[in-house]
């Protein structure tokens, strides 16, 4: 789910395995969109401690499953990335803390048309819980830019996702979905800036990953444009269960050229 500008916020939800829901969309006010939540450095450090819990402990003699976080090289420890728009932290979501804000964004009419998570908070909560209760192959994150929460991200193992049935996946392909929350932040190129920076952060923090992939809805022209501006290339059209998608790829070998 990746968008750009006005639709980088509303486009790339699809393949994390969570069920899709629809519901009435409400139109947030401008004041609601720009919730002034600023986080101190100490609080940001506290938030980044979320994702290190280990899972998969088994009795002696049994093979253990991957520890929570290993499938994405411990995303919670990646640290901030400096972008032309400011310093961005990807902070793994805590449901009880971020649900009201993320649900508020999902009820924006433009966002709802692509993410299909409008409605009461329970709709968004179910989507988040599916990822949070999993094995760490998909990590929902809050994007905090210069201390202000302003975007929602899903970083996921595309090669382990249902998306892999619809394109020639390679081991460790990593997918990205982006929603820019505040309406005032859309339509001015911010999506492309953040997508490029996060894609390169993924490639820097995941040495085994050769490609970052995305599958925005083909109808979401601003989102597709943002990916192209962010150094992704259009690879193919993909007929997914919930949409016809543009398969976008950012290659490690080509990132200095695009």
Stretches with model-predicted labels:
Residues 176-188:
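A short, internal acetyl-CoA/4′-phosphopantetheine-binding micro-motif in the GNAT/acyltransferase core
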Residues 104-118:
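Helix-loop element at the rim of GNAT/NAT acetyltransferase active sites that forms part
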Residues 218-236:
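Conserved active-site alpha-helix within GNAT-family acetyltransferase domains
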Residues 187-202, 225:
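Conserved acetyl-CoA-binding loop-helix of GNAT-fold acetyltransferases
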Residues 2-96:
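Conserved N-terminal entry element of GNAT/NAT acetyltransferase domains
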Residues 212-224, 241-242:
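Conserved beta-strand-loop-alpha-helix junction that forms the acyl-donor binding cleft
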Residues 240-258:
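C-terminal "cap" of GNAT-fold acetyltransferases
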């Amino acid at each position: 789910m990746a968008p750009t500008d006005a639709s980088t916020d509303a486009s790339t939800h699809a393949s994390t395995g969570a069920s899709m829901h629809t519901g009435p969309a409400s139109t947030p006010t401008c004041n609601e969109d720009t919730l002034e939540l600023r986080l101190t450095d100490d609080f940001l450090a506290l938030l980044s401690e979320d994702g290190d819990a280990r899972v998969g402990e088994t009795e002696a003699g049994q093979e253990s499953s991957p520890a929570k976080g290993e499938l994405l090289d411990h995303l919670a420890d990646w640290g901030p990335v400096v972008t032309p728009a400011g310093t961005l932290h990807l902070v793994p979501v805590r449901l009880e803390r971020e649900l009201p804000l993320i649900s508020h964004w999902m009820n924006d009419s433009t966002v709802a048309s692509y993410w299909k998570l409008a409605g009461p908070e329970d709709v968004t909560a179910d989507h988040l819980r599916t990822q949070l209760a999993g094995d760490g192959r998909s990590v929902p994150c809050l994007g905090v830019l210069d201390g202000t929460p302003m975007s929602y991200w899903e970083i996921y193992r595309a090669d382990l996702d249902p998306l892999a049935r619809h394109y020639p996946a390679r081991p460790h392909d990593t997918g990205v979905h982006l929603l820019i929350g505040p309406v005032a932040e859309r339509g001015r190129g911010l999506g492309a800036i953040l997508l490029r920076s996060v894609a390169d952060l993924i490639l820097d923090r995941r040495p085994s990953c050769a490609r970052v992939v995305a599958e925005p809805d083909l109808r979401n022209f601003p989102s597709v444009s943002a990916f192209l501006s962010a150094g992704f290339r259009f690879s193919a059209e993909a007929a997914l269960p919930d949409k016809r998608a543009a398969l976008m790829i950012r290659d490690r070998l080509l990132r200095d050229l695009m």
